[in-house]
């Protein structure tokens, strides 16, 4: 399969970036050590177990009528401490802290998708903008207004489309 991908000049850069992402992931796994620097006390449980990192992924860009294009990208993956406890000053109240692994800054890229089934006079390449996180960190989870959420069935993406298998994780064995 690698030989097939390397036949085309455009794919060589993609394969090199993909191999780089795999090597970075392997290095992260091999050099990862348990975090013994976190000393949890009864009053300090806010960062216990935080592990939020930028992770290489393959992002499949899709647009109706165009050939899907896998590109190397990044995503925020990990876990962040969340807790609920009795308030220290008001014992009849509870203190809550919900943290989520989220991006802190993002990068944007323009990618051209090949669209073979266009009408005469239309361009065969569609420019698509994509975003990826610059860095990741544990931040307070934000709520999303329900009115802004469109169910996949209504949007027409239940079986196919850009929301289905949007990111694929690189499998390391």
Swiss-Prot record:
GO molecular function: hormone activity; protein heterodimerization activity; receptor ligand activity
Residues making up the signal peptide according to the UniProt record: 1-32
Domain of life per record: Eukaryota
Pfam families hit by this protein: DAN
Chief localization: secreted
Impact after mutating residue 148 to C: In allele Z5569; wing expansion defects, failure to sclerotize cuticle
Phenotype upon changing residue 130 to C: In allele Z1140; wing expansion defects
Tissue: Expressed in one to two pairs of neurons in each of the thoracic and abdominal neuromeres of the larval CNS. Coexpressed with CCAP in most CCAP-specific neurons. Coexpressed with Pburs in four bilateral neurons in thoracic and abdominal neuromeres of the ventral nervous system.
Paired cysteines (S-S): 52-101, 66-115, 76-136, 80-138, 98-141
PANTHER family assigned to the protein according to its UniProt record, in alphabetical order: BURSICON, GREMLIN 1
Subunit structure: Heterodimer of Burs and Pburs.
Described purpose of this protein according to its UniProt entry: Final heterodimeric neurohormone released at the end of the molting cycle, involved in the sclerotization (tanning) of the insect cuticle, melanization and wing spreading. Heterodimer specifically activates the G protein-coupled receptor rk.
Name of this chain's protein: Bursicon
Organism name: Drosophila melanogaster (Fruit fly)
